[in-house]
Swiss-Prot record:
Gene Ontology terms describing biological process: cellular response to peptidoglycan; endosomal transport; immune response; innate immune response; intracellular protein transport; phagosome maturation; phagosome-lysosome fusion; regulation of SNARE complex assembly
GO annotations of cellular component type: autophagosome; clathrin-coated vesicle; CORVET complex; cytoplasm; early endosome; HOPS complex; late endosome membrane; lysosomal membrane
Organism for this UniProt entry: Drosophila melanogaster (Fruit fly)
Pfam families tied to this protein: Vps16_C
Membrane topology: Peripheral membrane protein
Stored PANTHER family: DEFECTIVE SPERMATOGENESIS PROTEIN 39 (PTHR13364), SPERMATOGENESIS-DEFECTIVE PROTEIN 39 HOMOLOG (PTHR13364:SF6)
Family: Belongs to the VPS16 family.
InterPro entries, per the entry: Spe-39, Vps16_C
Function of the protein: Essential for phagosome maturation and the innate immune response to bacteria. During phagosome maturation it is required for the fusion of late endosomes/lysosomes and phagosomes. Not required for autophagic flux.
Alphabetical UniProt keywords: Cytoplasmic vesicle, Endosome, Immunity, Innate immunity, Lysosome, Membrane, Phagocytosis
Name the record gives this protein: Vacuolar protein sorting-associated protein 16B
Phenotype reported upon loss of the gene: Viable and fertile, with no obvious morphological defects. Strongly susceptible to bacterial infection, displaying reduced survival after infection with E.coli and E.faecalis. The initial phagocytic uptake of bacteria by the hemocytes is not affected, however bacterial clearance by the phagosomes is severely reduced. Phagosomes fail to fuse with late endosomes/lysosomes, preventing the phagosomes from acquiring their characteristics and maturing into fully acidified phagolysosomes. No effect on endocytic trafficking and starvation-induced autophagy.
């Protein structure tokens, strides 16, 4: 036997021909595969692969063209891309599994995962109301976000209005996300309609009010505000009194700006009530009388817009001081006591008097104006400190006289320019202080 193996003739027999690894002797197997139909006709099957004859099957005999397209679409959306080099048998198994999951039973978790990752997923497989609710609840439990909006839009498209609103009513978080989506997408009408549907009339009213104010011109804003006021007056679902007051005040302001062209020229587009009040102060020519019958008068406008007395006084003070109409300042702060109408007008300020003095000083008001306001301060110590701060010499003298600081007055007099108005004023204060002291001493002697 060993001799046979060693002989050259044994290995040269055709039955014992050895396999050659040389390129020139390479065996070409392609014709066999083509003849068997494996590559020529896409012949792949889950049948037994032991018999090559059984491989003569086409994928078209298993899947229709339409079904195959669905499988390929689903595969394109799936992260589980087929690895390179997979055998035809394994590829067919994967395609058939994906086709079954796509056409017959919706995969809840897989679909939710795709949506949460921001990928597209076919939702039409979720046919029943229960399946659609399950998908929405699954996404809500995992955080939701844009995926929840995608499903809500699908539900709105495939369900009737009653079913869709019922789902939102049972899921407040989904409702809030859908409302946010409507707002961000600019569907203001849908946003307001949904708020009203769920009984949130106060929010709906504010949204309508904001939309009316955002209108292009004064005439359009007035029209929308009038519709808003009329709608809630007859709707049977009123808003809180504060909102009604705001709506009516805004309507009156638009009517005033439309009617008075001179006022409109002083204002920018969509002014605030305080800006309109400032313009009313600019066009007002009579500050001595408070004309409540004239809509453009500052006092009437402030009342219509329910602007606080402090805000009205501060606005008027700034406008008159900047216009250097200082004679009108005292009229702004004059009030007739309501308990005694026949009594003369009294000075009344609704905010801190110190702020008024500092603001007038900042606007470079004359010292006589500063002295007028400083004279209304009752505390002489505070008056002295503030007068020194704003460099109002006469007010400093008044405060020192009120504190009976005769020595300090004498020192101040010596620092003032000779024969100046302030020096004469200081001398008179010293004389008055000395006279009062002499009178007091005489009274004590008589007693």
């Amino acid at each position: 036997m060993d001799l046979q193996l060693d002989s050259e003739s044994y290995w040269n027999r055709s039955s014992r021909a050895a396999f050659s690894f040389d390129d020139e002797d390479e065996v070409d197997l392609a014709p066999d595969l083509v003849s068997n139909g494996i590559l020529a006709d896409d012949t792949i099957s889950e049948a037994s692969f032991n018999n090559s004859v059984a491989l003569n099957l086409s994928i078209k005999s298993i899947l229709s063209e339409e079904a195959l397209k669905l499988v390929l679409q689903e595969q394109a959306l799936d992260d589980r891309v087929l690895p390179k080099g997979v055998s035809p048998e394994e590829e067919l198994k994967l395609l058939r599994r994906q086709l079954q999951s796509t056409l017959y039973s919706p995969n809840l978790e897989a679909t939710a995962q795709k949506l949460l990752q921001g990928k597209t997923a076919p939702l039409e497989m979720f046919k029943s109301l229960h399946e659609k609710q399950q998908l929405l609840d699954t996404l809500m439990a995992q955080g939701g976000g844009h995926a929840v909006i995608t499903v809500l839009l699908f539900l709105k498209r495939t369900l009737n209005t009653t079913q869709f609103h019922g789902i939102l009513r049972e899921r407040p978080k989904a409702l809030e996300q859908y409302l946010s989506y409507l707002k961000e997408s600019g569907d203001l009408a849908g946003h307001i309609e949904l708020l009203q549907l769920f009984g949130r009339h106060q929010e709906a009213a504010l949204k309508q009010f904001q939309a009316a104010l955002a209108s292009g011109d004064t005439s359009t804003r007035k029209k929308h505000l009038q519709l808003l006021v009329d709608a809630y007056a007859t709707a049977g679902v009123g808003v809180i009194p504060l909102y009604e007051q705001v709506f009516h005040a805004a309507l009156k302001m638009q009517q005033l700006m439309e009617k008075d062209s001179a006022l409109g020229k002083l204002l920018r587009d969509q002014p605030t009530p305080v800006e309109v009040l400032y313009a009313c102060c600019q066009v007002n020519s009579n500050w001595k009388e408070q004309d409540m019958l004239k809509p453009v008068s500052p006092q009437r406008f402030a009342a219509d817009q329910q602007i606080s007395p402090a805000q009205y006084e501060w606005t008027a003070l700034n406008e008159r001081a900047q216009a250097q109409a200082y004679a009108d300042l005292e009229c702004i702060f004059e009030r007739v006591p309501s308990w005694h109408p026949l009594k003369t007008k009294q000075f009344h300020i609704s905010f801190d008097l110190t702020l008024a003095v500092l603001r007038l000083y900042e606007l470079q008001a004359p010292s006589t104006v500063l002295q007028l306001f400083l004279s209304k301060m009752g505390n002489s110590v505070e008056k002295l400190a503030l007068a020194q701060r704003v460099k109002c010499i006469k007010a400093v003298i008044d405060a020192m006289a009120g504190l009976k600081q005769q020595q300090e007055l004498q020192q101040l007099k010596d620092t003032l320019p000779e024969r100046s108005e302030e020096q004469f004023y200081c001398e008179n204060a010293l004389k008055s202080l000395q006279s009062k002291r002499w009178t007091t001493d005489n009274i004590k002697l008589k007693l």
